[in-house]
Regions:
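An exposed, glycine/acidic-rich loop-and-rim segment of catalytic or binding clefts
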Residues: 2-355
Length: 355
């Protein structure tokens, strides 16, 4: 039975102590987590030749996780994605959230869950698992309700990373949680993923955005568009620079509506790093997966872990989540969490090898 290894990391700018938690399975693969942002710091899995590769982007020091705007590996909340102009109405009351991304509220605001140090619980009786908890007070970044949040990470001997989110609030509020890991299955230092990664998405439709990067409220078929990943294709083949949607976001930064999303657990996406042979399957209980092709990543070697430099399209994200800006689109499935009701969602990232 493998255990969780805990080491000190670095203090935040506020003097808060942080730690790294490494779950290593019996085959030598591992996942390392940080209590700042309940974040994924590394995922090390074997390639087709048996060599171990770290397949997520990350920072060398704590200040990258604390201040940079990429959200590498972070737990994002209370509400992931953009809320148009930071405004929504709940139970007849208008709310104005902090605007931290142009004219929008993004990923929970300036002091979102990704910027907070969570309490970590490691129990030897629960193998291969780290549980993070956070108390978010009423009014936190403008959201109503005292909220208790839990994120449980488990990494098993089959190289399956399971993330389970749960939350409860004493008032009606908005809740839409995700993990913002950036995957490069050829290794985090291997450069662009556009021409050496295949991606398949279990979605016949996606949600278009406007020039402000907010959902239009429509749900559009992917057929005959560059957003059609219903069969595996190179990620770069989906970035059609002549497509207005791609131009708005400088790449893919869109929600894909999953097929069979009324089922309890569905396949969201499959990917493969062609050079490494490492594969990734993503299953989720959520309605959709937001795919982001690292369109604005610019991390210099003095910040990237292992002195890595990360640029545009150096990774892709599979952010399983509820519909974006749902509070402002009544036709979208709601992201309202009712008082004293339980929010629970689960995602599995399954790593394998295509030899």
């Amino acid at each position: 039975m493998s255990k969780v290894r805990v080491v000190n990391f670095e203090p935040t700018s506020k003097g808060e102590n942080t730690h790294l938690y490494t779950i290593e399975n019996n085959s030598g693969a591992s996942v390392t987590l940080c209590d700042l942002g309940a974040s994924v710091v590394s995922i090390k899995v074997p390639d087709k030749n048996g060599s171990i590769r770290d397949v997520v982007l990350g920072y060398e020091h704590i200040d990258g996780y604390e201040f940079d705007g990429t959200y590498f590996g972070a737990t994002v909340g209370r509400c992931c994605g953009r809320i148009a102009y930071g405004k929504f109405t709940l139970n007849g009351e208008d709310y104005q959230l902090p605007v931290n991304n142009g004219s929008n509220h993004l990923h929970g605001g300036f002091n979102s869950f990704s910027r907070k140090v969570w309490l970590a619980v490691v129990d030897d009786k629960v193998p291969n698992t780290v549980l993070f908890t956070l108390d978010s007070p009423d009014g936190d970044e403008g959201y109503p309700g005292n909220m208790k949040v839990f994120v449980r990470y488990t990494f098993d001997d089959e190289n399956v990373l399971t993330i389970k989110w749960s939350a409860v609030s004493d008032k009606d509020t908005i809740c839409n949680l995700t993990n913002h890991s950036y995957f490069n299955l050829n290794g985090h230092k291997s450069g662009k993923v556009t021409e050496n990664h295949k991606l398949k998405i279990n979605a016949n439709s996606f949600i278009p955005i406007n020039s402000n990067l907010n959902p239009t409220g429509e749900i559009t078929p992917v057929k005959n568009t560059s957003f059609d990943f219903t069969e595996p294709k190179l990620i770069g083949n989906g970035i059609d620079r002549k497509n207005e949607q791609i131009c708005f976001a400088n790449g893919i930064d869109h929600m894909f509506v999953l097929n069979n999303s009324d089922e309890e657990f569905v396949l969201a996406a499959e990917a493969e790093g062609i050079d490494s042979g490492i594969t990734l399957k993503c299953y989720t209980s959520q309605k959709g997966v937001h795919v982001y092709t690292a369109n604005y990543v610019d991390v210099l070697s003095n910040m990237g872990k292992d002195s890595a430099t990360y640029g545009e399209n150096s990774a892709f994200c599979l952010e399983t989540q509820g519909f974006p800006d749902a509070a402002n689109h009544k036709t979208f499935p709601t992201t309202i969490l009712k008082a004293n009701e339980n929010y629970t969602q689960t995602t599995k990232y399954i790593f394998g090898i295509n030899k």
